[in-house]
Amino acid sequence: MQKVNKKLNKVYRHPIILERKGNAIQNNDGSWTKSEWVEFRRVFANVKNLHGEEYFIAGQTNEQGTLKFYIRFMPGLNNETKSSYRILFKGKKYNINFVDNINYADEELELKAIERGMTDAAI
């Protein structure tokens, strides 16, 4: 099932899962249980690879696992909260490293994400 945003002329054809990092839990003995990732929302996205100049600017390390995900606007997902979310796409996990509310229109978000394991921020 394809979702089309006619105003932006984009097809959201790829199902992705956004996960949110849960809170760490303190056990009865005072130790802490590591926080788990939990499914936050299933959405459809337009997915693109970085290319050209954009690829080289991002290329501080091996950025071949960097993708751009375009999704409908979601309140609360922004650059301040990006580390609390990650993306599951085609069996791989992606850490979000940039969120752009395109033209501040509150209609669509561009999420730049790096495949987990290709960055030191892999949690």
Model regions: which residues?
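N-terminal intrinsically disordered, low-complexity, charge/repeat-rich segments that act as generic
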Residues: M1-I17
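Short, conserved turn/kink motifs that form compact alpha/beta structural patches or helix kinks used as
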Residues: V4, R20-I25, W32-I123
